[in-house]
From Swiss-Prot:
This is Translation machinery-associated protein 7. The keyword Cytoplasm does not apply. Residues 21-50 form a coiled coil. Keywords: Coiled coil.
Amino acid sequence: MSGREGGKKKPLKAPKKQSKDMDDDDVAFKQKQKEDQKAMEALKARASGKGPLGGSGIKKSGKK
C-alpha cells in the first residue's frame, strides 16, 4: 500500500447539481430578497453615520 492510495476514495469536491428551472414564484421571491437586501444596506449606511443610540444607560464611574 503506497502513500498515494491511502485515505478516502471519494473526490474532495462533490459534483455540481443541475440548476433547476425557476418558476414565477421563485423569481418573485429572489427579486424581493434583493430589494430587502438593498433596503437593509441603505439603513445600515444611514445608521452608521450616527453615534451610539440611547446613551442614557447605567453609567460606569471610575474607582470609588
